[in-house]
């Protein structure tokens, strides 16, 4: 081989041929030998031999790169199959871990399968990890995967990231619009959800049944009857096919907006009635304290052969509570397991405790709690605590409050209920101690808010809130009214600073 190289260097026209031969051999040893021999001959000063060496090195490098790419391609194909297999067998955690440890990009279809699995299992954190892996390995998102991620972020409540993905879409069809509307409504930002709905309509996107399910829920929460009727009219005009979810949301919307006749008429016109739509009707009457209507509808539901579910029974028990119907409450409570095989849960026990408490049967309520399998359920003790506060039973109040705080020590509302219970019984010092204990524990109560609708716009207010654009004028008016009441020596009930929170 050395002889071949040396003789070849004397013929510059054959240098390129030698390069190809060496490339075919793919041996770094001969490449270095070629350079050494060339430097010792007359060709060492020739630019041609230098170029030949450069070409040779480049060709060898390309060969290595090609081999690396082929190897990587094989790894990726194997990884794709493995990840899909893990998803099919429900091993999502292993799939995400393997994806990260590989440090490789996979096919868009594989990413889509992983994200879909995260969505179905409500493993939103794992979905975000997959998105982070895409970013780390430099994967360029296509429009389909952007929509997949948008839906995942919207479901998880991360509307900021969902909004960024939404705005980055080149084409916004109905699916991303629905995801954004639903995301805002589920997070309790119904007003913003309606804004997006109207923005979608201005962009000439035709809504579907999923759109209206979210819009009707938003109108229910905001008590926006006119907006709900307008959406219902669009649904009828566009001949949008309904489903059980939309039907129940529509019935619920009319009842929540105090339009009983419209709500019942929609229910009567339904082609299919099931436990969900029946429960919406019963719940609608219960929401407004129509106890007799709740019980009538419940009986009619059973007559038509529709079996109630735990939610239906909870609505009925709550109605019995509001109506002070203790015996009826017991009847339906025992009927759950006896007639329908439904095991009462914590909320059902809490409803019965509340019913007994309203009737002043506190000792019976306490004994019922102690015998129940849900005595470790905080709302059960919360119901007893509320009843003790109303009837001024300090002994049971302290017992219920102690257990309540023990089960849920981080809930600021529990401390407030306890303190208010002491205050209602005239024990101001004890109430102050509870508030100090709450402060020392670093526990805060989530602020409540009030809202009103003026000229089609909903305005929300919280304590010490200055975020409203007319805050200065609002507070000025409040001070004027306060001064006026003081001038005429009028003090509303509960204005004393030591009153319950």
Curated annotation (Swiss-Prot):
Entry GO MF terms: RNA binding
Ranges: PPR repeats: 107-141, 142-172, 173-207, 208-242, 243-273, 274-308, 309-344, 345-379
UniProt key word Methyltransferase: no
Domain of life, per lineage: Eukaryota
Family of the protein in this entry: Belongs to the PPR family. PCMP-E subfamily.
Entry keywords, A to Z: Repeat
Species of origin: Arabidopsis thaliana (Mouse-ear cress)
Region Type E(+) motif: start-end pairs: 456-486
Keyword Repeat: yes
Descriptive protein name: Pentatricopeptide repeat-containing protein At4g16470
Pfam families to which the protein is assigned, alphabetical: E_motif (PF20431), PPR_2 (PF13041)
Region span, Type E motif: 380-455
GO biological process, one term: RNA modification
């Amino acid at each position: 081989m050395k002889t071949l190289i040396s003789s070849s260097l004397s013929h510059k026209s054959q240098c390129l041929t030698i390069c190809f031969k060496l490339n075919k051999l793919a041996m770094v040893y001969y490449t270095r030998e070629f350079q050494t021999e060339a430097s010792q001959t007359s060709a060492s000063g020739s630019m041609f031999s230098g170029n030949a060496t450069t070409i040779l090195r480049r060709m060898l490098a390309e060969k290595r790169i090609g081999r690396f790419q082929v190897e990587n391609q094989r790894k990726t194909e194997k990884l794709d199959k493995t990840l899909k297999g893990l998803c099919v067998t429900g091993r999502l955690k292993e799939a995400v871990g393997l994806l990260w440890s590989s440090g490789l990009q996979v096919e868009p279809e594989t990413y889509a399968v992983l994200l879909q699995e995260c969505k179905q299992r409500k493993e939103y954190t794992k979905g975000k990890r997959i998105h982070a892996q895409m970013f780390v390995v430099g994967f360029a998102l296509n429009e389909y995967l952007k929509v997949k991620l948008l839906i995942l972020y919207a479901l998880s409540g991360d509307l900021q990231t969902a909004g960024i993905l939404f705005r980055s879409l080149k084409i916004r069809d109905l699916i991303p619009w629905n995801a954004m509307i639903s995301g805002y409504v589920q997070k309790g930002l119904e007003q913003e959800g309606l804004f997006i709905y109207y923005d979608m309509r201005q962009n000439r996107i035709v809504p579907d049944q999923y759109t209206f399910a979210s819009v009707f829920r938003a109108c229910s929460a905001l008590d926006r009857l006119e907006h709900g009727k307008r959406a219902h009219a669009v649904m009828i005009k566009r001949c949008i096919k309904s489903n059980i979810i939309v039907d129940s949301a529509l019935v619920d919307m009319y009842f929540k907006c105090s339009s009983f006749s419209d709500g019942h008429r929609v229910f009567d016109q339904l082609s299919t009635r099931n436990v969900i739509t029946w429960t919406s009707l019963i719940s609608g009457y219960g929401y407004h304290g129509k106890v007799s209507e709740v019980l009538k509808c419940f009986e009619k539901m059973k007559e038509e052969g529709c079996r109630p579910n735990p939610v239906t029974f909870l609505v009925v028990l709550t109605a019995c509570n509001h109506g002070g119907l203790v015996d009826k409450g017991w009847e339906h409570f025992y009927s759950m397991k006896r007639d329908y095989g439904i095991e009462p849960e914590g909320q059902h026990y809490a409803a019965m405790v509340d019913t007994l408490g309203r009737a002043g049967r506190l000792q019976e309520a306490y004994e019922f709690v102690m015998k129940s399998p849900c005595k470790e359920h905080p709302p059960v003790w919360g119901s007893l605590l509320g009843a003790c506060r109303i009837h001024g039973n300090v002994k049971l109040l302290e017992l219920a409050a102690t257990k309540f705080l023990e089960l849920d020590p981080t809930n600021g509302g529990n401390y407030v209920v306890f303190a208010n219970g002491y205050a209602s019984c005239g024990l101001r010092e004890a109430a102050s101690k509870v508030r100090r204990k709450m402060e020392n524990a670093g526990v805060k109560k989530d602020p409540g808010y009030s809202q009103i609708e003026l000229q089609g716009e909903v305005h929300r207010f919280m304590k010490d809130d200055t975020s409203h654009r007319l805050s200065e004028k609002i507070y000025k008016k409040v001070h004027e009214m306060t001064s006026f009441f003081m001038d005429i020596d009028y003090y509303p009930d509960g204005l004393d600073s030591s009153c319950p929170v």
